Design a protein with these regions (language model features):
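Short, residue-level hotspots on alpha-helical faces of the histone-fold
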Residues: 54, 153, 199, 203, ...
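Glycine-rich, often acidic, oxyanion-interacting loops/wings at catalytic, nucleic-acid
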Residues: 46-136, 196, 212, 258
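Low-complexity, acidic/Ser/Thr- and charged residue-rich accessory regions of DNA metabolism proteins
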Residues: 182-186, 217-264
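Short helix-capping/linker segments at secondary-structure and domain boundaries
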Residues: 28-30, 59-63, 117-118, 156-160, ...
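Phosphate-backbone recognition surface of nucleic-acid-processing proteins
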Residues: 8, 136-139, 145, 149-224, ...
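Conserved phosphate/pyrophosphate-binding and hydrolysis machinery centered on Walker-type P-loop NTPases
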Residues: 10, 38, 75-78, 103-107, ...
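Phosphate- and other anionic-substrate recognition elements at nucleic-acid/protein interfaces
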Residues: 1-93, 175, 190-191, 209
Length: 264
């Protein structure tokens, strides 16, 4: 109906309002979930933290760009460490006064952003509304504070998902399909998703096989099929299943041995 309104030949506010009212009267409009005010405020803080992280990356990239533009050689693995950076500015003859002032400004901005980001994360971890929930989620191997906070604040009430498949779809970890006649197009990931959750879960899935043997087996099994990205997505989907189970049951994550699984 809404697509018909958008493509109508005669279109004005009165006609559109009448059509929308008819849809509402017939219960054709889907219900939109709205998180509580407390969750929205804390989610705003977490998303602001993500902005600070992007700015930190920009500052690090700018420092590297300035050094390369001036032909200064440096150790990229130690560049952003405080001691090495001070030594580089003090002893390298290729760095003139103008470049040195810009590099110091970038470094000061980077340190300030890092301190602010750490303070925001600590404040969310110590929040009484989130503390117990985050601790339970962090009991899952490979789930750290950022992944736990992102899940808790972006999902809100986990009971609104009736199945794991719906949660996976909300996180954007499934493909999209567009078909017309005999033509079927599939995309690796759907664009209709929560992009904050999608990014965090994919990044967590890249590190998860190092900390969780079960996820490592899943990753290796999927990787043998020839696609590394599909293996990462499979791990991310399994993480969603773990997060939903812990969040719904309100219990810590338990790892069962093979003997206990057989007995169960």
């Amino acid at each position: 109906m809404l697509r018909a309104i958008a493509a109508a030949k005669k279109k004005n506010d009165r006609i559109d309002a009448n059509k929308i009212c008819d849809c509402l009267r017939c219960d054709f409009l889907p219900v939109c979930y709205m998180a509580s005010t407390a969750i929205r405020e804390r989610r705003r803080t977490l998303r602001y933290r993500n902005l600070l992280v992007r700015q930190m990356v920009q500052m690090k990239t700018k420092i590297c760009t300035l050094l390369m533009a001036a032909g200064v050689s440096y150790d990229k693995e130690r560049l952003h460490k405080a001691g090495y950076f001070r030594e580089l500015l003090a002893n390298n003859p290729d760095i003139n006064d103008g470049l040195r002032s810009l590099l110091k400004l970038c470094r000061e901005t980077l340190v300030r952003l890092s301190k602010t980001e750490s303070a925001l994360v600590r404040s969310l971890e110590r929040d009484p509304l989130l503390m117990e929930r985050v601790k339970r989620l962090m009991s899952i191997p490979a789930v750290g504070p950022i992944t736990a906070l992102t899940w808790a604040l972006e999902v809100g009430e986990v009971q609104r998902f009736s199945s794991i498949k719906k949660a996976i779809s909300y996180c954007g970890l499934c493909g999209d399909q567009k078909s017309s006649g005999n033509t079927v197009q599939r995309t690796p990931l759907s664009k209709q998703r929560n992009k904050h959750l999608q990014t965090t879960l994919i990044e967590a899935a890249k590190m998860a096989p190092r900390y969780n043997p079960t996820l490592a087996q899943l990753y290796n099994r999927e990787r043998q099929k020839g696609n590394v990205n599909r293996a990462t997505l499979a791990v991310a989907r399994k993480l969603v299943a773990y997060l939903m189970a812990v969040d719904r049951g309100q219990t810590h994550f338990l790892v069962l041995d093979n003997e206990e699984r057989a007995a169960a």
